[in-house]
Amino acid sequence: MFHRHLCKLCSKTPSAATLASPLGKLQEERGEGVAKDPKKDKQHRQIFLQKFRERLDSDTTGKNTLAGFIDLPEGISPTMAAVGPLKRGEEPLPPWLKMKVAKGVSRLPRFNRIRNSMREKRLATVCEEAKCPNIGECWGGDEEEGTATATIMVMGSHCTRGCRFCSVLTSRTPPPLDPDEPQKVANAVAEMGVDYIVMTMVDRDDLTDGGAAHVVRCVNTIKEKNPLLLLEALVGDFHGDLKLVETVALSPLSVYAHNIECVERITPNVRDRRASYRQSLKVLEHVNSFTKGAMLTKSSIMLGLGEKEEEVRQTLRDLRTAGVSAVTLGQYLQPARTRLKVSRYAHPKEFQMWEEEAMAMGFLYCASGPLVRSSYRAGEYYIKSLVKQRGAAATKSNTTTTTTTTTTTTTTNTASLAAATVTDSATLQGE
């Protein structure tokens, strides 16, 4: 009971320190150091607000309004609200990159089939992980023509490299490979009902072969279950080991894709130090020379990282010299605050210019646009026809080679037999 009374006394009596200070004396005079009557306090507030309103209403100079207290830029009103204020130095997103998601996409049978299959088997897709704006277009596809495409990422979700443009998680010691992954991917692809699939990978520098053997197992398992499927593999550089590149190129792929990413000058600032511009070119060139042009090769360039026009042009020339047949160009968009900032937003007309120049250089296929990504509409009609033409040409070449070899062998054997007969006849006559 005594404690309760003491608490009440303390709450009403100002402290010695408060009374000793000039501010404390002022508070005491105003009655701020002691408990107040809530009703009186409310009345004081109402009176103050009423007087303040009257003051604003009676003012004719405009100095007592909100605009009179702050300096605003021209064209901005004091009541204008900005949603998501830009940070200093950031450029606003241009209108051509503000893409609305098509209504009803999630109700498309093929879109749902792909999404459900991926989630049930707990497989990662670049489409969802990167929040690709083209997901509805690629997953929905054309139900009759079968142009739907999905990009599956294998070998886990942790990459051993730390490229400054990529939002994929980085780890020096990622989890071990899933031995059942090839079969899971093959089953998922079969359930999707697509006729073109893109399979990409994280870099695994912790593995001796960089994951090349695992990639080959995935490709073989997918093709065994889906023989007519066209398969594009977007793979890494495998430490620059060309023997490992050959191992992957020998698998039943339709398209061998490896991204150059950006122009040579800015590569050290954009990509991981273990990835280089010249190494990527060497990989692509070796695939073409090793397969004697039978394998369709593909690469991709990002704009908006600080490149110059002539540098982009030179990169296209380098890719074409390396034998690359298909190329894509798209706008780099910062995936997270910790990643590289966008240096500029290229206009759609610029992308159109690069597409025209690429085709003039001799590329068989070029997709160029602000929202284009490396696997954008990979399964569209034209690139599928290119793959089939290459496959038919390779089969014809092998058949011709086999026929020629057989004919040569038969001719040689016949000539040898004829020579032996003549020799035997001469021997008999001599006897």
Curated annotation (Swiss-Prot):
Which residues does the annotated region (Disordered) include? 21-43
Q: How is the cofactor bound?
A: Binds 2 [4Fe-4S] clusters per subunit. One cluster is coordinated with 3 cysteines and an exchangeable S-adenosyl-L-methionine.
**Which Pfam families does this UniProt record tie to the protein?**
LIAS_N, Radical_SAM
Entries under Gene3D superfamilies matching the protein: Aldolase class I
Family listed: Belongs to the radical SAM superfamily. Lipoyl synthase family.
Supply the source organism for this entry.
Answer: Trypanosoma cruzi (strain CL Brener)
Binding residues annotated for [4Fe-4S] cluster 2, in chain numbering: 159, 163, 166
Segments forming a coiled coil: none
GO terms assigned for molecular function: 4 iron, 4 sulfur cluster binding; lipoate synthase activity; metal ion binding
Keywords on record: 4Fe-4S, Iron, Iron-sulfur, Metal-binding, Mitochondrion, S-adenosyl-L-methionine, Transferase
For bias type Basic and acidic residues, the affected ranges are: 26-40
Q: Which SMART domains match?
A: Elp3
Q: Where is the Radical SAM core domain?
A: 142-364
Q: In which pathway does it act?
A: Protein modification; protein lipoylation via endogenous pathway; protein N(6)-(lipoyl)lysine from octanoyl-[acyl-carrier-protein]: step 2/2
What sort of enzyme, by top EC class, is this?
Answer: transferase
Q: What is its EC number?
A: 2.8.1.8
Q: Provide the residue positions that the database annotates as binding [4Fe-4S] cluster 1.
A: 127, 132, 138, 375
A GO cellular component entry from the record? mitochondrion
As for subcellular location, the record says: Mitochondrion
Q: Required co-factor? A: [4Fe-4S] cluster
Official protein name in the record = Lipoyl synthase 2, mitochondrial
The record makes one more remark, namely:
This protein may be expected to contain an N-terminal transit peptide but none has been predicted.
Q: Catalyzes what?
A: [[Fe-S] cluster scaffold protein carrying a second [4Fe-4S](2+) cluster] + N(6)-octanoyl-L-lysyl-[protein] + 2 oxidized [2Fe-2S]-[ferredoxin] + 2 S-adenosyl-L-methionine + 4 H(+) = [[Fe-S] cluster scaffold protein] + N(6)-[(R)-dihydrolipoyl]-L-lysyl-[protein] + 4 Fe(3+) + 2 hydrogen sulfide + 2 5'-deoxyadenosine + 2 L-methionine + 2 reduced [2Fe-2S]-[ferredoxin]
